[in-house]
Amino acid sequence: MTGGTGLVGTHLLRQLVSEGRKVKALYRSAFPAFLTKEEIQKIEWVKGDVLDAHALFHSLDGIQQVYHAAALVSFNPYRKKELFKINIEGTANVVNASIESGVKKIVHVSSVSAMGRLRVNTPIDETMFWTPETSNSNYGQSKYLSELEVWRGIGEGLKGVIVNPSLILGASDWEVSSSKMFKSAYDEFPWFTEGGGGFVDVRDVAKAMVTFMDADISGERFIVSAENRYYKDVFTRMANEFGKQPPRKKVSPFLAGLVWRIEWLKSILAKKEPLLTRETARTGQVMVEFNNEKLKRFLPSFQYTPIDQSIKDVCKELLKRYETH
């Protein structure tokens, strides 16, 4: 597995280990903070990077299945070059190494950001393919182009499935990735936008990936999304679970332009990813719904975790970790 130290990778490793599977995971510098010592010891760790094609090839010796979860998630325009290099070139390296090493199947973690936006006021599904639009983020473009590398691999004989999760809720380092949403709720970030989108529990993403890997399914991509919710509702529930004040100041499009600039300056001073960028300020003003019927059709017994339960579970785990350390 690549990306074993990230949000999806950590929970995927936990599921694979709990099922008694033999797992080899790539890591760059540190083991996942949210895995137990016992879980870490059950995994064969290989130090490496998806940008090191030579090391990737050797790490796949004897491997039959590959989960590719390594990616950079950033909406900071100043990281575009880094974003494209890791997400596109990294995926190409994983696909090439898999083919050369005789890997039988790959499950690739993409994103709903890589889906098209052609039909107005219609839930997005897997038939809507990418078109160049100003509303597309650099991150979404990088994930779309990384998908093309996986499709190329499938065309060259590699079995593969692509999963496109919506906004993932899970316990992880809340200074990075989508877990920053929980940190902002804990810190009583006062602003909210009128928009919304799809949400899914990270445990469901992991469960779907393992199920697709084991199933006789290839050459397909699937939206993995439990519910469509407004951002204000989700942030309010997070704040309530933390015992904090929920967001109370509505961000108009004009005000969003001011807020993202303030957040940008704060991020420079703190040397951290900004909570709000020009891209996220723009997309946060609209409700984008996602259709999850294809996954249900291929996996009739698959059950999603209700988002309210996901929020409750994640807040509980984060409080346990950060308020006791």
Regions found by a protein language model. Give the residues of each.
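Active-site Tyr-X1-5-Lys
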Residues: 134-161
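NAD(P)-dependent short-chain dehydrogenase/reductase
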Residues: 157-199
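N-terminal Rossmann NAD(P)H-binding glycine-rich loop of SDR-like oxidoreductase domains
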Residues: 1-19
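Conserved catalytic-site region of short-chain dehydrogenase/reductase
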Residues: 75, 112-122, 168-174
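Substrate-positioning beta->alpha
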Residues: 93, 145, 176-177, 193-214, ...
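NAD(P)H-binding glycine-rich loop region in Rossmannoid oxidoreductase-like domains
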Residues: 32, 43-89, 97
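Mid/C-terminal beta-alpha module of Rossmann-like enzyme folds, strongest
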Residues: 208-275, 292, 297, 306-307, ...
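Conserved Rossmann-fold NAD(P)-dependent oxidoreductase catalytic core, especially the SDR/UDP-sugar
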Residues: 81, 86-138
